[in-house]
Amino acid sequence: MVHVCYYRNYGKTFKGPRRPYEKERLDSELKLVGEYGLRNKRELWRVQYSLSRIRNAARDLLTLDEKSPRRIFEGEALLRRMNRYGLLDESQNKLDYVLALTVENFLERRLQTIVFKSGMAKSIHHSRVLIRQRHIRVGKQLVNIPSFMVRLDSQKHIDFALTSPFGGGRPGRVKRRNEKSASKKASGGGDADGDDEE
């Protein structure tokens, strides 16, 4: 008997806009989607949702007394997390700075954006393709999620995967075919394969 799991994850990952056809919002969203090479608006709403949850947590902590153990403990943990992901500088160690964070701060820390800005890809869209086709690794771990949030200490370890043709791995399909036809011509083995691809 095959066991089928009917578990469903009910955790919200994004929140759609309250007013669907607001012109200013539509224009600003489209600009961000184009600038950061996002697949759809849902990817943007997902970032906005995580930002709003972080800001709500900071706002909640700011209402507590400064000497409150919960504010000290949770506030420091939140700031540490923001510093680790490069969203805040080491000098910005107050909860007020968390409230000033924007969606762009988060989008700048995505793997897709960082691969493009580091010059490994020709465009932001090329960067997404490289990541999805498993050409990029962070440290020793191959990462194929464009929305992967890069930590500050991991940023210098972003490189091409060892199995990728860009990282000195096995050459790609077209290059292998060209090398094969070149070796045939060199050995004088008659015509190259007739089934050329366009």
Curated annotation (Swiss-Prot):
The modification Phosphoserine is found at S68. Residues 109-180 form the S4 RNA-binding domain. This is Small ribosomal subunit protein uS4z. Binds to the translation initiation factors TIF3E1. It comes from Arabidopsis thaliana. Pfam families: Ribosomal_S4 (PF00163), S4 (PF01479). Keywords: Phosphoprotein, Ribonucleoprotein, Ribosomal protein, RNA-binding, rRNA-binding. SMART domains: Ribosomal_S4, S4. Gene3D superfamilies: RNA-binding S4 domain. Residues 163-198 are annotated as: Disordered. It comes from the Eukaryota. One of its GO terms (biological process) is translation. GO terms for cellular component: chloroplast; cytosolic ribosome; cytosolic small ribosomal subunit; nucleolus; plant-type cell wall; plant-type vacuole; plasmodesma; plastid. Belongs to the universal ribosomal protein uS4 family. NCBIfam families: PRK04051.1, uS4_arch. InterPro entries: Ribosomal_uS4 (IPR022801), Ribosomal_uS4_CS (IPR018079), Ribosomal_uS4_euk/arc (IPR005710), Ribosomal_uS4_N (IPR001912), S4_RNA-bd (IPR002942), S4_RNA-bd_sf (IPR036986). GO terms for molecular function: mRNA binding; rRNA binding; structural constituent of ribosome.
